[in-house]
Amino acid sequence: MRKAIPRASRLRPTKEVSVMAWIEDAASSVLLVRQAAGLKLWTLPGGKVKKGESLVKALKREVREETGLRIQVGSLLGVLDRRDKDAITLLFAAIPSQASNKAKRKQNEIKKATFQSSLPNKASPSAKYFWSARRSPVKKAPKIRASTHQLPTALL
């Protein structure tokens, strides 16, 4: 019989968890947002998961805040473990759930939101990683396959 781990000894996640959305339009262009402050990098819409918030709710909130779009969240497409930042980013497929697929900026953190057919040079490390994994031949980056399995309810 296994002994329960004493409450004070239980593991607590130490990594910051972020979520990002891979949203394509009919022409297979991908929705990118440009940061308004700092290095003003292009990145995929998304952000940090708040304490007690599900991954799906966090992604819906972040995309809505940054672009004005309401989305339906699909499969997990990839994971980026940023050991240098003690952070992990999860990439999900998503589609706009409203009739219009035009992105509108709702937050002052984002300067611009637009569908792009290629990744701009001034892109965030996570955007470069996921773009390369989704769009490049296998020799440049490991291919990320969309999961056919649903995430455990505890993660949602």
Name each model-derived stretch.
Residues 23-24, 32, 94, 115:
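Conserved hydrophobic "DFG−1" position in protein kinase catalytic cores
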Residues 15, 40, 72, 86-88:
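Residue-level preference for beta-strand/loop junctions
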Residues 1-20:
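Acidic, metal-coordinating catalytic segment for phosphate/diphosphate chemistry
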Residues 80-102, 114, 129, 133, ...:
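Active-site-adjacent beta-strand/loop module that shapes the phosphate/pyrophosphate-binding cleft
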Residues 39-42, 108-156:
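Nudix hydrolase/Nudix homology domain
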Residues 25-65, 69:
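Conserved Nudix-box catalytic region and its N-terminal flanking loop in Nudix hydrolases
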Residues 70-78:
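A short coil-to-beta-strand element that immediately follows conserved catalytic motifs
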